[in-house]
Regions:
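A preference for well-ordered globular domain cores
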Residues: 1-128
Length: 128
C-alpha cells in the first residue's frame, strides 16, 4: 500500500494551527504589572473599561484592579492609560498573526511552509 504523502494544503493547515496556538499562548498574551506576569482577555478588558467609566462618572479618583489574589490600586488616569495601551498591544498582536496567516497562504512549496517563522514581528511584552 502506498504511504500517504501530505499535500501542500495539509502543510498549510498544520502551519496555521501552529500560528493559532502561538497566538493564543502566553508567549504573545502576557504583560507585566508591578512585576506580576498576567493577561486579561478581550471580554475582561471591555468589562474593566466599563467599570472604570462607571467609577469615574461617580467621581472616584482611584480604582482597585484584581488579578487572582493580587490587588492593584491605581489612579483612574493610569488605569485608563494601561487599558488603552493593552488594547493597542492586543490589536498589534492580532494584526501580526493575520499577516502570518496570509503569508502562509501565499507560500508555494511545502518546504517554504515548513520553514516559515511565525514568531517574528510581535511587539515586546508590556511592563506597567
Amino acid at each position: 500500500t502506498p504511504t500517504y504523502e501530505p499535500t501542500i494544503d495539509d502543510y498549510r493547515r498544520r502551519k496555521k494551527d501552529e500560528i493559532a496556538r502561538h497566538d493564543s499562548s502566553d508567549e504573545v498574551n502576557a504583560f507585566y504589572m508591578q512585576g506580576q506576569r498576567m493577561w486579561v482577555d478581550k471580554a475582561t478588558r471591555a468589562g474593566l473599561m466599563l467599570r472604570l467609566q462607571a467609577e469615574q462618572s461617580m467621581g472616584k479618583e482611584t480604582t482597585t484592579l484584581w488579578y487572582g489574589s493580587h490587588q492593584f490600586e491605581l489612579p483612574m488616569a493610569n488605569a485608563f492609560q494601561m487599558l488603552y495601551v493593552l488594547e493597542l498591544y492586543a490589536s498589534q498582536c492580532y494584526d501580526n498573526t493575520q499577516r502570518h496567516l496570509a503569508a502562509v497562504d501565499a507560500l508555494e512549496s511545502k518546504e517554504e511552509i515548513e520553514a516559515y517563522d511565525y514568531r517574528s514581528g510581535y511587539p515586546e511584552e508590556l511592563e506597567f
